Amino acid sequence: DSGKEYSITEACNLIDNNLQDNTYKVNFTGGEPLIQHEAVNELAKHVKARGLPTYLESACFDSKKFLHVLPSIDFVKIEFKTADSEFIDEKHYPNLIKNTLECLHAAIDAKKTTYIKIVVSSKTELSSFKELLEQIFKIVSKKNLSGFIIQPTTSISEPTLEQLLVFYDNVYPY
């Protein structure tokens, strides 16, 4: 059970009733928002009609669903997984990376404020990380990105500071 279900109207009312004077954007994140892409799109349109920017963080497993919500989103953080990530099995990785790269390309083409995030662990191989960087920077220039986040896992397989600095040193030249 993932909590209480709300209709779009109920969710819009919750948003309206809980906006604060200092609310500067509304985030769609946690779990995977694209699983409910139609609802995210409707809620994002509602938020934008209130004059607030919208932010989506997604692993972009489905570029068609991403394209559906993209017009209603202002800020995008696209989460990439390395080939050796334990979050997805090897045989599905090529399709995931294809979709994620398509989403990145679409966000840049749509002139969205775009961030990239790569989650790394102590098990992340430098070769896998470098290969992913090459794929990313074949289609995007750093001038088109608002940020590049290297996010360490915590508790389980947490990378050392030295490992994080090596990953950083490999992103920096781009």
Residue ranges and their predicted role:
Residues 10-19:
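A short, N-terminal amphipathic alpha-helix
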Residues 22-25, 34-170:
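Conserved AdoMet/S-adenosylmethionine-binding subsite of the radical SAM
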Residues 30-31:
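Short acidic donor-binding/metal-coordinating loop in glycosyltransferase active sites
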Residues 1, 168-174:
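Short, intrinsically disordered, charge-balanced linker/junction segments flanking boundaries
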Residues 1-10:
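Canonical Radical SAM [4Fe-4S] cluster-binding loop centered on the CxxxCxxC motif
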